[in-house]
Amino acid sequence: MLSILKKLFGTANDRTVKKLFSEITKINSLEPAIQKLSDEELKNKTVEFKEKLKNGATLDDIVYEAFAVVREAARRVCGMRHFDVQLIGGLILHRGMITEMRTGEGKTLVATLPAYLNALTGKGVHVVTVNDYLASRDSASMGKIYNFLGLSVGCIVAGMPDEAKRAAYNADITHATNNELGFDYLRDNMKYSLQERVLRPFNFAIIDEVDSILIDEARTPLVISGPVNDNSELYGKIDKIVRMLNTSDFEKDEKLKTINLTETGITHIESLLSKEHLIKPDTGLYDFENLTLVHYVNQALRAHNMFTVDVDYLVREGKVMIIDEFTGRVMEGRRYSEGLHQALEAKENVKIQNENQTLASITFQNYFRNYPKLSGMTGTAMTEAPELKDIYNLDVVAVPTHNKVTRLDLDDEIYGSKKEKYDAILKLIKDCYDRGQPILVGTISIEKSEELSSVLNKEKIPHKVLNAKFHEQEAFIIAQAGRFKAVTIATNMAGRGTDIMLGGNPEMLIEQLDEDHNYETKAAEIKAQISEEKKQVIEAGGLFVIGTERHESRRIDNQLRGRSGRQGDPGKTKFFLSLDDDLMRIFASDRISGVLRTLGLKDGEAIHHPMISRSLEKAQQKVEGHNYEMRKNLLRFDDVMNDQRKIIYEQRTEIIKSKDSHGFLNSTTEELAKKIVLTFMPVGSYREDWDIENLSVELHRVFSMKFDHNLVSKNDVTEEEITKIVIQTAHDIYKSKEEAYSSELMHNAVKYILLTTLDQVWKDHLYSLDHLRQGISLRAYAQKDPLSEYKREAFNLFEQMLNNLKELFIQTVYHFHIDLKHIQKEDVSLEHKKLQKNMRESREDPAFSKYNAGSSLETDLKPVVSRVDPKDRNPDDPTSWGRVSRNELCPCGSGKKYKYCHGANE
């Protein structure tokens, strides 16, 4: 019934596209007039548009004319004219939606339309791609259009210095990778001045391969971390022990990707740990004193049994490198967290790097939700439309192709074993190769790629292998996969970003030439050869795409299919499956095996059956649903941290912008002073209950004050009066610092202390949240909702962090010392980095000028003394020693630390 209604009235997508086609006529009607403009007049349209926007016009008021201008500029500069369907794609992107356009439909050119239009506001546009190569390529090729129209273009790639990044981000349109954008956002929020930051405020982002970035990579947070304690030796010992376990010692669930020790496994591993003296003979692994070892054991178990080399990671140059399960690419600079990476390094017997502590992190889900306006484009998004709408509030519109798709998608062939499947694949490859038809074989892992490659080598069939191990050659290899007799094996084709042109890509081949006197001749020969090969390939049937097994996601399978049949080219696709494939074995084996038994499948025979196709689709839907729930759950938890992150980053920015740091200092000083006094002299308490001894200790610890006990002996003194005196004295102490150093220097010092203290407590807070998150799922056993528990405890931790911030900040302000000897007199403002260096030398050993306010409290301060070179110290003359650290050996030559010798009374 539903299908009949759709045929009668069309789908919602059909109606949207039909409406957009009516708008395209408005753009097309402007084309004749725009074409008559001179280059100078066409360029001046940008100035005209900006003037209109300044006078109150909106982007929607100028959208049709702006698109017509970009179309004409592209025709003149690049020789490319936007098709009507590309204009539709541009309108969809401008309106903050996702456009699904088939491979080869010119998504890169489509992005120029909304990028130009939105850049006219002067707030910047980010065009996001999945790797540096694509960012550089697109900024260079499409940048010609923007530059012609008077807009600036920037490109961000890994390893650029901040100055270059800042200039690129300040351009009207910036091409960048999703990783660099996320990391730059985190880095900016660790800087100490606004001038050091590279990013501008968020405005508009166009994401290429949007499904890859917002869905496939959604579960992988970007993390900036620093090293913690070195436990490499322990990882090595645990690895040796785990290797001795039997398969009966643990049980794993491949669907849920979990692994746990069995009862016999616990007994076995406790015995092994005891022999290695890692636990005492009379204790168990789960005894309180041994609980830290559980973490190491679990990660070693996962490393050996849930992660496979050349599938989940590869080892290159003595390093374990993560492979993106969706794209087959190496994830440069990424490491598994929670000790898993160290466990893998121990497993592969390479150098074990230190564990890292998180300093800052964010998921792509929360990073991209910062943009007020977000859009994206991809060849495959409709299958994930509900998730994109639910999480990012992005609608998906499928745009029809410019030319009709003539590709033939053949039915899957299912075999009983992997060997039979490979035999069938080999037979087809041989047939295509003999006829000259180019073949692209898609695999789901590097391991499978190399397995198939070795089979082809034995048969002496020349071929290219494209996977994470040869990332540098990726674009060139894939661009030539459409040549006559070409055989290309590739891991997942998601996000490759390079078209496969039948006959090959002449431009890329020409780029390989040396510019000698024969350059033009050789270039012409290449073009002629490619043109001839294109005819031969079309006659042979176009590109034949072979899938060696189904992926968990239908979308990834569709991306592989989409490599064939670009822009109306002929082509074929076919998937070969076996009961040994992971997806079949884990999710659909029982049902399909039953069908095969019923049908009486013989060795070497293939089967085509609608029930099997339905079972496979259900299995994929089941996995997709499971992964969606995992991403949604991750987001619910990450939103808790994201709310806190926003507060901290906003506060940090306010501190940096602040021209007067005294407000927070004074209010916090008063708050802590009251808190300390009331802790030891509670309101309404008797005098004999006052804890004056500990009050003195606490005031000394926080404010470096000496409390006059005689003050309490006055009969009429109250806790309120004591509080007022403490507050006033604290303010006076600070004023004495301003007199000693200058108010501007102190302002910068206080601001710097506040920023560094905030960074420290935030880092510790992230560490606490990580630990809370790891164990929170166990609350479900106590009939408690883990998410609610996480929210509650995360809020308590956040409050605790803010209290720690205040105390640590005040304590540091009242105890720090600046070594004036290392500061030039004219440099009153003092750069943060120089201040950091001087403060690090002295924070452990506060020393100040003597101060007495004439009140009953006096400060425990010393004269400001600079450091002296040890060789200039006279052991018999303490006045020549200068400032001595309390932990240094005493200059008198006694051999004792200074704090136990001449510094004992300080």
Curated annotation (Swiss-Prot):
GO cellular component: cell envelope Sec protein transport complex; cytosol; plasma membrane
Record-linked Pfam families: P-loop_SecA, SEC-C, SecA_DEAD, SecA_PP_bind, SecA_SW
One GO biological process term: protein targeting
Bias kind Basic and acidic residues: ranges: 834-847
Positions annotated to bind Zn(2+): C890, C892, C901, H902
Recorded superkingdom: Bacteria
SUPFAM superfamilies per the UniProt record, alphabetical: Helical scaffold and wing domains of SecA, P-loop containing nucleoside triphosphate hydrolases, Pre-protein crosslinking domain of SecA
Positions of region (Disordered): 834-887
Membrane topology: Peripheral membrane protein
Subcellular location: Cell inner membrane; Cytoplasm
Cofactor(s) recorded in Swiss-Prot or TrEMBL: Zn(2+)
Predominant place of localization: membrane
Protein residues bound to ATP: Q86, G104, E105, G106, K107, T108, D499
EC annotation from Swiss-Prot or TrEMBL: 7.4.2.8
PANTHER family named among the record's database cross-references: CHLOROPLAST PROTEIN-TRANSPORTING ATPASE, SECA INNER MEMBRANE COMPONENT OF SEC PROTEIN SECRETION SYSTEM
Similarity comment text for this entry: Belongs to the SecA family.
Function noted in UniProt: Part of the Sec protein translocase complex. Interacts with the SecYEG preprotein conducting channel. Has a central role in coupling the hydrolysis of ATP to the transfer of proteins into and across the cell membrane, serving both as a receptor for the preprotein-SecB complex and as an ATP-driven molecular motor driving the stepwise translocation of polypeptide chains across the membrane.
Protein name: Protein translocase subunit SecA
The species this protein was found in: Rickettsia felis (strain ATCC VR-1525 / URRWXCal2)
